[in-house]
Amino acid sequence: MAKQKFKITNWPTYNKALINRGSITFWLDDEAFQAWYESATPSSRGRPQRYSDLAITTVLVIKRVFRLTLRAAQGFIDSIFSLMNVPLRCPDYSCVSRRAKSVNISFKTPTRGEIAHLVIDSTGLKVFGEGEWKVKKHGQERRRIWRKLHLAVDSKTHEIICADLSLNNVTDSEAFPGLIRQTHRKIRSAAADGAYDTRLCHDELRRKKISALIPPRKGAGYWPGEYADRNRAVANPRMTGSNARWKWTTDYNRRSIAETAMYRVKQLFGGSLTLRDYDGQVAEAMALVRALNKMTKAGMPENTTRYGGDLPEI
């Protein structure tokens, strides 16, 4: 089959969105300036916080977007304030490190309405370990630490609807219920790979009245009648010899957009976390998701192709 050829129909708009990703005013906007310092009355005794949660979130987002250390991010933002002649100061790097353990970072967009297809997958973010070249030449060391980033993506808009970070030993199916409960929007169907073919995942989808598009594992048997979606998926390869027809009729192949989301994460922000405390790593990951959603909202390519499908954008 010939390689697909795509034609972007909104190239001027998308090109401008790509350029704006490098603009500091795109990430450091008027909303952040106005709410930089904490103005709310403290609810408990002790020294009040000087910087708002939005200020800490902004520092973490800029750190991820420009791939800076906390100290470098502090110097970078302070220099921007100085050049703009804005009477603000960046939080000290130690303050950001401490506040990251408790800050609540919101990554959800104001989009509303029904989601036709929600696609789910996970990827690993490295905390400690050598690079691939060293592993290739000398083998891997014993100590390699990873975290798992779980994402649920709207296949139409590419927006990340739900996100969670877990330890490496947490399976995809174990993280699924907590992930899907993050949204109360109506979802028509949810697609995931065979790792999610467990009763735990199917029960959660049935509870939320979501059609399950999960291919059964090899040698899978039928479940009780209430699992009709899964039983149809089990029956199809037995009748046709493969899952190809089931994937085509259910539009399961849109799940590849979850792989696109993982690719965008690694290409735009790197595949590692730098904060050492686990709660801080959660905040760093959510800042990454917030930045990705902001890029998505700013502009995505619209395309046409002879064979149909979506352009693998970043």
Language-model segments: residues:
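Basic, low-complexity segments
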Residues: 1-45
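Helix-centered, glycine/charged polyanion-binding patches within enzymatic domains
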Residues: 2-7, 194-267, 275
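Sequence-level motif detector for i,i+2 pairs with an aromatic at +2
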Residues: 3, 23, 113-115, 253
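Hydrophobic alpha-helical segments, principally membrane-spanning helices and signal/leader peptides
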Residues: 5, 37, 54, 77, ...
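Acidic, contiguous segments within the catalytic cores of piggyBac-derived transposases
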Residues: 16, 23-35, 233, 242-258, ...
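Polybasic low-complexity intrinsically disordered regions
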Residues: 41-57, 65-71, 75, 79, ...
